[in-house]
Amino acid sequence: MSKIPVIVIVGPTAVGKTSLSIELAKRLDGEIISGDSMQVYRGLDIGTAKITPEEMGGIKHYLIDVTDPSVPFTAAKFQSETRKAIETIHQAGKLPIIVGGTGLYIQSVFYDYDFGNASEDKAYRAKLEQLDKVILWQMLEQQDPESARQIHENNKRRVIRALEVMHLTGKPFSEYQVHNVLNDTYKPLFLGLDLDRELLYERINQRVNLMFEQGLITEAKKLYEQHLVDVPAVRGIGYKELFPYFERKSSLEEAKELIQKNSRHFAKRQLTWFRNRMDIDWIQAGVSSTESEALNKATTFLTAK
């Protein structure tokens, strides 16, 4: 059985992944799967820079607006749903194209990534929920140093899950993680977009300004009024920074500057992650040859035996 070819476009936020994916889909008869952990949520449009129907240009997209913010969409769920979408697109005789910046989610599709599908212990989880995030992370560091290096202490939900898996199975959560072996089902080409740091940061700042012009405050206020401030979906950059403003604990300008700052830091982490974790063919973004270079690489990849 021949492997399914998949084009994967990755890179930091605001680098130009979306426009490139549309161009390649049009030229290569492809359909697009969003590889963004936030764009799966309905109602989170402006803050996630979600592609609009007009921007889609008639290209079918998958894993956009598939669940409500109150319902968590995990990496394991993304893995299974993306694999289904790849099969659907391939069976239709089209090219699957994944585009996004959530490295863990994308990596899980192509590598033998085991998420530790242990059952839940609600009582144990409830006990952990009462603890401070710093204490939880210290517990994880003592019990599973490798997982502690991979999971930020602010990611309380994932820290708790790691502790819960160890509690249920007696096995460190890190032992369930990625094995650096490609899944035999797929033949992926990883294309990464890179941009000069100053230009990228300028783009990020401009994007945040545009989000405010498009109505980010209204979008975030709706989530705030629905009491969704603590769900994983709205912990993403662009929403949580505005909640103190709604509570009159910060100014609007402070909130905007914090979103820009957090977005820049996030872009830096994305680049570091992709460079250290995946075998990527990098392309310079923001130049006249970006699209043609990506198309040439994709065409060569698809025609190679």
UniProtKB/Swiss-Prot annotation:
Q: Which residues bind substrate?
A: 13-18
Gene Ontology MF: a single term: ATP binding
Keyword Oxidoreductase attached: no
Main EC class the enzyme belongs to: transferase
Q: Binding of ATP: at which residues?
A: 11-18
Site annotation (Interaction with substrate tRNA) points to 102
GO BP terms: namely: tRNA modification
Q: Which Pfam families does this entry report, sorted A to Z? A: IPPT (PF01715)
For the region Interaction with substrate tRNA, give the residue spans. 36-39
Reported EC number(s) for this entry are 2.5.1.75
Q: Which reaction does it catalyse?
A: adenosine(37) in tRNA + dimethylallyl diphosphate = N(6)-dimethylallyladenosine(37) in tRNA + diphosphate
Keywords annotated in UniProt: ATP-binding, Magnesium, Nucleotide-binding, Transferase, tRNA processing
Essential cofactor(s): Mg(2+)
Provide the assembly information: Monomer.
Family named by the database record: Belongs to the IPP transferase family.
Q: What does this protein do?
A: Catalyzes the transfer of a dimethylallyl group onto the adenine at position 37 in tRNAs that read codons beginning with uridine, leading to the formation of N6-(dimethylallyl)adenosine (i(6)A).
Q: What is this protein called?
A: tRNA dimethylallyltransferase
Native source species: Listeria monocytogenes serotype 4a (strain HCC23)
In the UniProt record, what gene is named as encoding this protein?
Answer: miaA
